[in-house]
Amino acid sequence: MLVGMSTPYIEWQPNFSVGIEKIDKQHQHLISLINQLAAAIANGHSRETLARVLDGLVDYARWHFLDEEKHIAEKLEPDLLHSHQAEHDQYLATVLSLQQDFETGAIDLDEQTLTFLFHWMGTHILGSDKHALL
C-alpha cells in the first residue's frame, strides 16, 4: 500500500545500466518521474496534480524513446530496430489509454498503475534495452 510512503517506489540499481551514460541518465529520470507519481498518489494529491505528473511522464517517455531509438539505429539491424520501436509504441499506447481513462474519470491512478509502469520499465531496460545497446 502506498499510504505513508517514505521511500522511493523504484530505486535505480547499477544493473539497470545499459553502458551509455546519456541513456542511463534518461532512465534515471524516468524512474524519478514514476517516483513522483507514486508520491503524489500516496499523498492524496488532487486529480489535477496527478494528471500533470502523468503528463510529464508521458511527454518525457515519448522524447526518451525517440532519442534511444537513434542510438539503437546505429547498432541494430532494421528489423530488430522495428521490434524495439514496436515495444515503445505499445507502451505509449497503453500509457496514453491510461491517461485518457484517468482524465475522463473512468479510472483512478493507484498501485496497480505504478506496478505496470515499474514492471514494464524494469523488464524493458533489463531485457530489450540492454540487448540493443550493450
Positions of PLM-derived features:
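Small-residue-biased structural context
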Residues: 2-134
